[in-house]
Amino acid sequence: MSKQSLELKATSFTLSVLHIKNHDLIALAAELDQKLSQAPQFFIGAPLVINLKAVEKHCLDLSALKTLLMDRQLIIVGITEASPELIEQARALGLAVIKSGKQATTAPLPQRETKVVKQNVRSGQQIYAKNADLVIFGAVGNGAEVIADGSIHIYGALRGKAMAGAAGDHNSVIIANSLEAELVSISGQYWLAEHLQQHSLDKRACIRRDGESLMVETLPQ
């Protein structure tokens, strides 16, 4: 008997959702370019689902929007929460139509290992803790990037970028002795520097997911 050439299995992936809140493509392009300039490595090449709930009653050229995003190296896999007219456009463009629903309950994750870094992480450096939590005894400087599939604990200042829960774990957290980050992300939900400025702290703080947003908690020293 010959071996199977393929096998179809059900699985799940963590995808970022881009919420379109304006049908003006010129305004969209300008705002998107600004965000991309702040964190290009976080966005470029990332698969996205487009949420069209806010523009479902407007005349949106989905083909032009797709071109706008692809020109910026963003990969569009489908749309969600769209009007029948936009769904028809999406199918003509070969995009998936994804139904919005409650998040499925995930199985408990196995206990992770911990990757420990006993030095400062400097500009241009990237550290990735695959299938592990990341503990840094030092600061994460401007232009540095730290990524973990689990949580990130920084015993110093966070001034660069920190991305926890990279494998999709919503329960991951980011803890730092002071929070002055360029970007923080937990399982695809992110804040850029402009949002973080109102939360910048010289005290020990924890960032965690709060539904479809993030929240900051001050911790005891």
UniProtKB/Swiss-Prot annotation:
Stretches assigned to coiled coil: none
GO biological process: cell morphogenesis; division septum assembly; regulation of cell division; regulation of cell septum assembly
Cited InterPro entries: CAP/MinC_C, MinC, MinC_C_sf, MinC_N, Septum_form_inhib_MinC_C
UniProt keyword terms in alphabetical order: Cell cycle, Cell division, Septation
TM spans (from-to): none
PANTHER family: SEPTUM SITE-DETERMINING PROTEIN MINC
Function: Cell division inhibitor that blocks the formation of polar Z ring septums. Rapidly oscillates between the poles of the cell to destabilize FtsZ filaments that have formed before they mature into polar Z rings. Prevents FtsZ polymerization.
Name of the featured protein: Probable septum site-determining protein MinC
Species of provenance: Shewanella denitrificans (strain OS217 / ATCC BAA-1090 / DSM 15013)
Name of the gene: minC
